[in-house]
Amino acid sequence: MYDEKICRYTLNRIFGYRPKIAHALVESIGSASEVFRIGSTRLKEMLPYTKGICLLSDREYEKSYIELKRLEAAGIRFICNDDAFFPALLKECEDHPMGLYVRSESPFREIFTECTNIAVIGTRDISPYGREWCERIVSSLPGTSPETAVISGLAIGTDITAHRTALKKGVRTIAVIPTGIDGIYPYRH
């Protein structure tokens, strides 16, 4: 018997940059665990030209099980796209990931359902004028109702200015890290 969460995690690992393939498999077969129950040989017959199908194996499933345990030991959770806490607006995107990696001091319901999230994006080469305005805008957020969280990517420039200002002002922050949760770049952030 295959665990649905581990199967979705494995699909995310294999088809991370091509999530539409993972979604199509789950939608056409019924569930991520059913994709693994059928097995890669049968899937190759059904979808002969789909890259990555050969990786849908018990070996990859076991590798995912071990990785998930390692992440959980480090305080990192994988929230599947069928979880109640998966961001609803993200789920509306047809190419949303099969899940998100989350390390948080706050409960998930607070992060994804009880906060108004404001994305702050911009240049890595921020000017003094841009930095001043980013700080002003983020500084105006405390006390807003409902509570607000700043979402950005922890990159140099605008992103880190928004995060640092938010933390100084007691505003929650959410970092969307493209490099993976166990390796933040740049390291100093």
Label each region the model flagged.
Residues 1-2, 80-189:
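Glycine-biased, small-residue-rich flexible motifs in mid-sequence functional cores and linkers
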Residues 1-85:
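Short, small/acidic-rich helices and loops at N termini and domain boundaries
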